[in-house]
UniProtKB/Swiss-Prot annotation:
GO CC annotation terms, alphabetical: cytoplasm; excinuclease repair complex
ZnF (C4-type) ranges: 258-285, 747-773
HAMAP family per the UniProt record, alphabetical: UvrA
SUPFAM superfamilies: P-loop containing nucleoside triphosphate hydrolases
Main location: cytoplasm
Location of the protein in the cell: Cytoplasm
Protein's recorded name: UvrABC system protein A
Source lineage: Bacteria, Bacillati, Mycoplasmatota, Mycoplasmoidales, Mycoplasmoidaceae
Name of one Pfam family that matches: UvrA_inter
Residue numbers binding ATP: 38-45, 648-655
Function: The UvrABC repair system catalyzes the recognition and processing of DNA lesions. UvrA is an ATPase and a DNA-binding protein. A damage recognition complex composed of 2 UvrA and 2 UvrB subunits scans DNA for abnormalities. When the presence of a lesion has been verified by UvrB, the UvrA molecules dissociate.
Any one GO molecular function term: ATP binding
Keywords: ATP-binding, Cytoplasm, DNA damage, DNA excision, DNA repair, DNA-binding, Excision nuclease, Metal-binding, Nucleotide-binding, Repeat, SOS response, Zinc, Zinc-finger
Amino acid sequence: MNNKVNTRDFIVVKGARENNLKNVDIDIPKNKFVVMTGLSGSGKSSLAFDTIYAEGQRRYLESLSSYARQFLGGNEKPDVDSIEGLSPAISIDQKTTSHNPRSTVGTVTEIYDYLRLLFSRIGKPYCPNGHGLISTLSIKQMIDTVYENKEESKIQILSPIISQEKGTFKNKIEELKRQGYLRLRIDGNIYSLDDEIELEKTKKHNIDILIDRIILNNDTVTRSRIYDAIEKSVKEANGKVIVLVDDKELFFSQNHACNECGFSIPELEPRFFSFNSPVGACKSCNGIGFNFLPDTAKIVPDPSLSIKEGAIAYFRSVMMTPTMDLKREMSVWKEHDINLDVPFKELSKKEKNIIFYGDEDIGELKIDVNEQSIYSSSSFLYNNGLVNLIMRRFSETQSERAREYYEKFMSNLSCPSCNGQKLSIEALSVKINNKNIIDLTEKNINDLTNFFIELELNETDRNIAHLALKEIVDRLSFLENVGLNYLTLSRSASTLSGGESQRIRLATQIGSSLTGVLYVLDEPSIGLHQKDNEKLIETLKKMRDLGNTLIVVEHDEDTIRASDYLIDIGPKAGDFGGEVVAAGTVSEVSENKKSITAQYLSGKLKIEVPSKRRHGNGKTIELVGASGNNLKNVTVSFPLNKLIAVTGVSGSGKSTLINETLIKGIEKKLTNPFIVPAPFKDIKGLKNVDKIIKVSQDPIGRTPRSNPATYVSVFDDIRDLFANTKEAKARGFQKGRFSFNVSGGRCENCSGDGLIKIEMHFLPDVFVKCESCNGKKYNQETLQVLYKGKSIYDVLEMSVVEARDFFYEIPEIKRKLDLMVEVGIDYLKLGTSSTHLSGGEAQRIKLAKYLQKRATGKTIYVLDEPTTGLHIHDIAKLITVLNRIVDNGDTVIVVEHNLDLIKCADYVIDLGPDGGINGGQLVAYGTPEEIIEKKAVSYTGLFLEKNMYKDK
């Protein structure tokens, strides 16, 4: 009997042992929508990404030449016996698409490429000086325009060969003389080529060849002379002609050029509209859209102070003993009678401009360089102002410390030349339906789709553009279908959340219409409101229906229930996971008694709605008039000593309200005057807060040496313990001996890494276990010091829960490890490198550290989507931890979409009603029950009701 699985229908994995996987065998059906779920850290990603996708990628790389492989890396075979039936694999994970400021939603999705093509084919250039449509002219059309003037007019036909260029142009003038030309018009004056012409090298010049002088008559000879002269001018000046008719000057061009002012643009081609090409980019900012410049908001961070009180932060430390720079500035302020004793905000606009940008018309002022008096007798020529002064000092200094000081007063500010639009004035002059290409990229996806659907074109343009238009509209609709209708194409890719980046790549893949591909996705529902979840699920099904296999690592219940096949990894996390607990349809898995996921799916386990909501301490923080990004003058109160959930559809303004306005606004007032929050009018109730802490999902350390034990400071206590053993004292070992970061106790062969990097040149670098320490990071003498039979390396290899039991009798160590267990990271090894931690794990490690601190009752903790990467069982633990912080007297604000967390909040602030320009309003606020009452206007209320009362 042949039990071999047909690899045409299944991906057959045998003996997967990557990370914590325990010799996993699994048959995954092809051309199905497969979801892998399980507790956080159970091994889902190890199976999906580190095993199945990694092997698919390795096989592809193996097919390339060794020369190509050296540039790609990453062809190490995963720890698995075999994988059969594997298709070409594409990973769509949560990593931010790009940190390059040039990368935007438009470039990542390739929609901008089609826009560039569209504008180069049917775009119409307009004069930026208000002279209307620019068109190309034939020589006949030029002559016809000349003949619109009265007969007997004196006309001169000139060829503009040099326009606003520096130089003496001696060689050019000599060449024109040899060609037989007699006269030139230089900077408006006529010169004979027989004259000695001397031009200033540093000055910009205009040089025109005088081709012919003619009396305008409507006879054949005159018309022929005009034709010949214009034709010659066109050849010499690359299509341009100037015709002087009496005192009137006419400008003509065979290229795109304005007849009135001469503004011209080159032939339209796609790269002309690229801010990544020198041809199209703004020359001032090189296509980035911003420049690093002095920021008036940082120079004067607190305008309620007077200048004498230190309003100007740049001079704050020298107000009592003025420096030369300050003396110069104050001399100018005195000249303009600027009052140094009134609050800076009460100065007039003109006075502020003088302070920031100087007064070039003021001439010479006197100052004494030797005395403390600020009004004096030595003269200097003034033209600075603080902005110019700081910019000059920043540009000229060679000192790194000085540069860091000047940078405190500088920001990336919108480029004044292109107003942040990245392109040259010529490219921005080309329009379709009165909109330039950047105008279109600044529309949200919804509005942009409608613009192209409703676009009216003549038959010729429609025939030219229909293919490009179809691609644009199709790709925009794919973005809408994954819930990104609030984004703009101009949005920088580096500002996108992990979930947004992943869904953009998802939309791009749909646009490619590939078939027979294995897609591996990591929680595509992250950051997505329940309102848009159905669209996302339909998109995933559409990818499956194209003939692809989808393996989706996911915790979202709706996505799990929509799957064709469900694989539950567990039963728990870390060393207690790594097994396939259940596999089959959702209904089959739901009946599995060993699966924690099954217990939640069947309703046997669930996160209960709290029996009562906390009333708080009666104090509030009120944010008044928040108007950053799409926020529409929002005023909102945050009741303190409560668990507050800030909700709303994707793009409604939650992150702007909390991360960019509330956090930065409070930090500016309390700790960092140089920080620049999004615009708001006021924050009331600051006396009720001593600090605000953002518990982000950023890594806990920048190097692989950082680990959970060092971050929560428990490793310090453990090293103290080892240093106090009899063996350590006998050998004279101090606490530092047990650190793998400094010389002494660490293995010097691998510098405490445990691994040695071997460069393979034409192959990827290989990391091998250090032979000196056998991968244990420490030298032999250090490892001989034991505590209860375990070395310091053995302790780092323990899981948190194992370490807690091991150090049960040491209260300080046990207390810190108890907190790590409480936040749900009991499965992590103490020595796990920070680079191997997920964002959710990093966030929970930070929570464990903050829980060590004594509550003040005045601290606000902010978490942005803390349920990212968490199984519902882990979310229950997280809610317990957040409740503990609030019960201790502090306040917790979570920006969240997860309904199980939202329903456990004491207070909900719901923004909306939709995303982008259709969001940014306070839709509802109050308890979850009060939000449900507003379900007619609140999408959150609508879905919250379904979640809270689904059993009723």
